[in-house]
Design a protein with these regions (language model features):
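Short acidic, Pro/Gly- and aromatic-enriched capping/linker segments at domain boundaries
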Residues: 219-224
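Cleft-lining beta-strand/loop regions that shape enzyme active-site pockets
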Residues: 6-7, 15-17, 29-32, 37-203, ...
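Conserved functional hotspot residues or short segments at active or partner-binding sites
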Residues: 233, 249-267
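Conserved catalytic motifs of ABC-family nucleotide-binding domains
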Residues: 22
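Short beta-strand-turn/beta-hairpin segments enriched in glycine/proline and small hydrophobics
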Residues: 1-5
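Short, acidic, Ser/Thr-enriched surface-loop or helix-capping motifs
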Residues: 227
């Protein structure tokens, strides 16, 4: 397992420190990390303090000092594409993601969107409860994800509504992980919409990180996520229905498919 940078957001400490897409985080303050959950828990800290990262970039390994700061990043951006297709870029599952996604969807419909492209590329996950709430907007009544625990019964999460009433296309890539894969997996298995892009990251384990008195960190796997059809995500990822490489080409294909679905709706 490794912690790979998807794409540093503009204005964040990661970008300002010089981190690049594809960089691998080996250690945080000397502590070896092999999961994004553990890395994130070690990287977080008070603003204006320093955290040391050991980075592998290609064949090179080097140390990088990052200055922490308070940042506010919108979870969602949205706009119209090619006249009548609404694009919702869901960048993370934070505490505001459901509200922002719902507002974006309503705004795009008001502006005349006849189809939606949901962009989950570079979304590394976040709060699963927000993912499940967002699934209500897109996935009709039925299973979203099953969570398999080591020492307790399997838990199945459902949607209860009617889902989206206009065509949907979903963008994914290798930066789509964890909660993004839960949502994309439900959309794919339930045949709500095609996935366009490249294979997703393959993070299907929900993990907790606990710091001990001596400062060491213990990583505990809490559960494993399975798609509605019982597919394991971890270590495998989701294969897109339409394989396309390159950010711009992926978006163009998604918009093309969305517009085609408007012209030729499936009954």
């Amino acid at each position: 397992d490794q912690v790979k940078i998807a794409r540093p957001m503009k204005g964040t400490p990661a970008e300002e420190a010089g981190l690049k897409e594809g960089d691998v985080i080996l250690r945080v303050d000397g502590e070896t990390v092999r999961s994004s959950d553990v890395a994130a828990s070690l990287i977080r800290g008070p603003a204006d303090t320093q955290v040391s990262l050991t980075i592998r970039r290609g064949q090179d390994t080097f140390e990088l000092s990052v200055t922490r700061k308070s940042i506010s990043i919108p979870a969602v951006e949205h706009r119209m594409e090619d006249g009548d297709v609404g694009l919702i870029a869901l960048m993370s599952f934070n505490e505001h993601s459901f509200q922002e996604t719902s507002e974006a969807l309503n705004d795009l419909k008001t502006r005349g969107a006849k189809a939606i492209v949901l962009d989950l590329r570079y979304n590394g996950g976040g709060y699963v409860d927000q993912c499940l709430a967002i699934a209500e907007l897109f996935v009709p009544k039925g299973t979203v994800v099953s969570q398999r625990f080591k020492s307790s019964p399997e838990k199945v999460n459902y949607t209860s509504g009617e889902g989206l009433d206009i065509p949907l296309v979903v963008l994914v890539n290798g930066g789509s992980a964890s909660a993004s894969e839960i949502l994309a997996g439900a959309i794919q298995d339930r045949e709500v919409a095609p996935l366009v892009g490249t294979t997703t990251f393959g993070k299907g384990l929900v993990q907790g990180a606990y710091t001990l008195d001596d400062g060491s960190v213990v990583k505990v796997t809490v559960s494993e996520s399975l798609t509605p059809n019982g597919r394991a995500i971890n270590g495998v990822g989701l294969e897109p229905d339409v394989f396309v490489e390159g950010d711009e080409a992926q978006l163009a294909k998604a918009v093309e498919l969305a517009k085609a679905a408007v012209l030729n709706p499936v009954s």
